[in-house]
């Protein structure tokens, strides 16, 4: 990715044209085992609460993008079993546009970042609401007093750390492929749909994101260096479908699957949902 250029794109198109002309060598997409197009990205950055449809639910929120990280061990590809263990509690899909970084981005203004975007793909940011609730803390944070930094004050806060409810195995479906940036006129105007079986549970558009792709990448670059192969997932598109049911009704333990996501210009991702009935194993020392 880091060394991708227009000449590489031309060579790839030439090879694809040659492959299409040789029908005997063609393999049906149904016969292919799809891995994530990036199996070991350096980091997967997710943007929290970036859909304007969620703004009326915010009691207090920052005026800039907020991020969390997912480990690459959570990744599976299109068509792979999305395995959910019963002890996870409620788990639902989150259809998102993913940006694949093509070069180093650090301290970059929004007008500068898009030249370092390699392409785009579909990301199902699978989320465990049950584990989010289990990992909730209500506590007093300690801060230096504004009028006397030698003393501290206690401020009541609520927080939940995202490692389990965002980073569990199978909680990141990436693919099926990467569409190069030159093929997408505007990543900020793409239709997004999500289905459970044949039922549409999300019918949205990336135009409803609070922050555009360039803004997200720029803001993030002032804190974390983005490198070739990194993935930035832009946030959930969750405007309900025609049935008015939403992704928040789609607890895999209740509705099963398959789950599929379509994004305009990027294709369709679909995965069977496998429920493992089991209890959490012993983890405390005797």
Question: Where are each of the predicted segments found?
Answer:
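Glycine-enriched loop-and-adjacent helix/strand subsegments that border the catalytic/binding cleft
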Residues: 41-208, 212-216, 278-286
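A conserved acidic, glycine/proline-rich C-terminal tail/linker
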Residues: 212-254
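A short, charged
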Residues: 1-30, 135-136, 144-158, 227-239
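Short strand-turn-strand beta-turns centered on an Asx-Gly dipeptide
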Residues: 196-198, 235, 264
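N-terminal non-catalytic cap/leader segment that marks the start of a structured domain
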Residues: 1-66, 88, 258, 262, ...
């Amino acid at each position: 990715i880091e060394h991708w250029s227009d000449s590489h794109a031309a060579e790839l198109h030439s090879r694809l044209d040659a492959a299409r002309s040789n029908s005997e060598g063609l393999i049906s997409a149904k016969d292919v085992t799809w891995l994530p197009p990036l199996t070991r990205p350096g980091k997967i950055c997710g943007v929290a609460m970036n859909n304007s449809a969620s703004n009326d639910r915010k009691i207090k929120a920052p005026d800039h993008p907020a991020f969390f990280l997912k480990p690459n061990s959570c990744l599976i590809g299109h068509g792979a079993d999305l395995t959910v263990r019963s002890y996870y509690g409620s788990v639902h899909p989150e259809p998102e546009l993913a940006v694949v970084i093509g070069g180093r981005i650090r301290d970059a203004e929004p007008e500068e970042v898009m030249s370092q975007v390699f392409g785009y793909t579909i990301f199902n940011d699978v989320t465990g609401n049950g584990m989010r609730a289990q990992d909730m803390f209500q506590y007093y944070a300690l801060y230096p007093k504004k009028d006397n930094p030698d003393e501290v004050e206690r401020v009541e806060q609520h927080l939940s750390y995202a490692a389990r409810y965002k980073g569990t195995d199978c909680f990141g479906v990436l693919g099926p492929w990467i569409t190069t940036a030159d093929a997408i006129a505007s990543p900020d105007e793409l239709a997004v749909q999500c289905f459970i079986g044949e039922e549409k549970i999300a019918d949205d558009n990336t135009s409803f994101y609070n922050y555009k792709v360039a803004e997200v990448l720029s803001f993030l670059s002032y804190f974390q260096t983005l490198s070739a192969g990194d993935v930035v997932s832009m946030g959930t598109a969750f405007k309900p479908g025609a049935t008015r049911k939403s992704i928040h009704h789609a607890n895999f333990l209740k509705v099963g699957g398959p789950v599929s996501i379509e994004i305009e210009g990027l294709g369709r991702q679909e995965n069977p949902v496998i429920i493992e009935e089991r209890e959490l194993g012993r983890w405390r020392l005797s």
